[in-house]
From Swiss-Prot:
The lineage of its organism: Bacteria, Bacillati, Bacillota, Bacilli, Lactobacillales. One of its GO terms (biological process) is DNA repair. SMART domains: HhH1 (SM00278). Residues 63-141 are annotated as: Domain II. It comes from Leuconostoc citreum (strain KM20). It is found in: Cytoplasm. Residues 147-196 are annotated as: Domain III. The gene is ruvA. This is Holliday junction branch migration complex subunit RuvA. Residues 1-62 are annotated as: Domain I. The RuvA-RuvB-RuvC complex processes Holliday junction (HJ) DNA during genetic recombination and DNA repair, while the RuvA-RuvB complex plays an important role in the rescue of blocked DNA replication forks via replication fork reversal (RFR). RuvA specifically binds to HJ cruciform DNA, conferring on it an open structure. The RuvB hexamer acts as an ATP-dependent pump, pulling dsDNA into and through the RuvAB complex. HJ branch migration allows RuvC to scan DNA until it finds its consensus sequence, where it cleaves and resolves the cruciform DNA.
Amino acid sequence: MYEYINGLITNIYPAYLVIADRSGVGYKLFVANPYRFEQNVESHVYVEQIVRENEMTLYGFIDENEKYLFNKLLNVSGIGPKSALAILASDDAAGLVTAVANDDASYLTQFPGVGKKTAQQIVLDLKGKLDDLALSAGMTVETVPTTDNQALADALAALESLGYSAKDVAKLQTVLANQKDTTDGYIRSALKFLVK
């Protein structure tokens, strides 16, 4: 197993790059976007080795967070290394983390090779598992919008604790924001709206 490779990036191709270590061995690393790396520059590339029946493949990453996200994506049913790299190539890790946190499967369908079922599976499998990535990378996850109306804020928090998705709660906030009511009144109005 390799954790990372320090070396000179000797070649860059559309799907992979070649990095030569100090002993002169060149490693072919499949990467999400090879053009983020510079040719003929000493680099520190994080690596994940995947062994299949008849092949051993190395995948390279620009930082530890990208590698972490790659491994989390591999744990999703229906996502293989190539699909995970295609998702990472969008360079929108924050968008991915936010979409998972907000149960927004429709956002995930914009990634190559991700259909509706796979997007729903990503949300299901990764929900709550990317929070540590968001914190370590300094990402801000956009969840339920905040409000100055304390009664509305309490009602929205109560609805979320009842199991309603952050996306539904955010919609409710826009619907209920123009009303003046108690926390109980907001919850009743929200439940009526949700049952429609």
